[in-house]
């Protein structure tokens, strides 16, 4: 019988040795928001608490400066 194994979640920022998450790095921030514009929780992404706080504040700062949208484009 086949068993399904889930991949172990790990914090990419800890593994790469990132000291601070930059709000201008839009490519990285887009990986942590949904299509509708919500911030993805750390239990889904595996991000540690320290970097999840930095990530959420960076996303909010990028939204305020209009680098990221608050919601998806309504068509």
UniProtKB/Swiss-Prot annotation:
Alphabetized GO MF terms? small ribosomal subunit rRNA binding; structural constituent of ribosome
Q: Which SUPFAM superfamilies match?
A: Ribosomal protein S18 (SSF46911)
The protein's matches in PROSITE patterns, at most eight in alphabetical order, are given as:
RIBOSOMAL_S18
The record's listing under Pfam families reads: Ribosomal_S18 (PF01084)
Which cysteine residues pair off into disulfide bonds?
A: none
Single Gene Ontology BP term?
A: translation
Q: Which keywords fit this entry according to its UniProt record?
A: Ribonucleoprotein, Ribosomal protein, RNA-binding, rRNA-binding
Q: Which GO terms describe its cellular component?
A: cytosolic small ribosomal subunit
Q: How does it assemble?
A: Part of the 30S ribosomal subunit. Forms a tight heterodimer with protein bS6.
Query: Which PANTHER family does UniProt cross-reference here?
Result: 30S RIBOSOMAL PROTEIN S18 (PTHR13479), SMALL RIBOSOMAL SUBUNIT PROTEIN BS18M (PTHR13479:SF40)
Q: What is this protein for, i.e. what is its function?
A: Binds as a heterodimer with protein bS6 to the central domain of the 16S rRNA, where it helps stabilize the platform of the 30S subunit.
Q: What protein name does the entry list?
A: Small ribosomal subunit protein bS18
UniProt source species = Alteromonas mediterranea (strain DSM 17117 / CIP 110805 / LMG 28347 / Deep ecotype)
Name of the gene encoding the protein in the UniProt record: rpsR
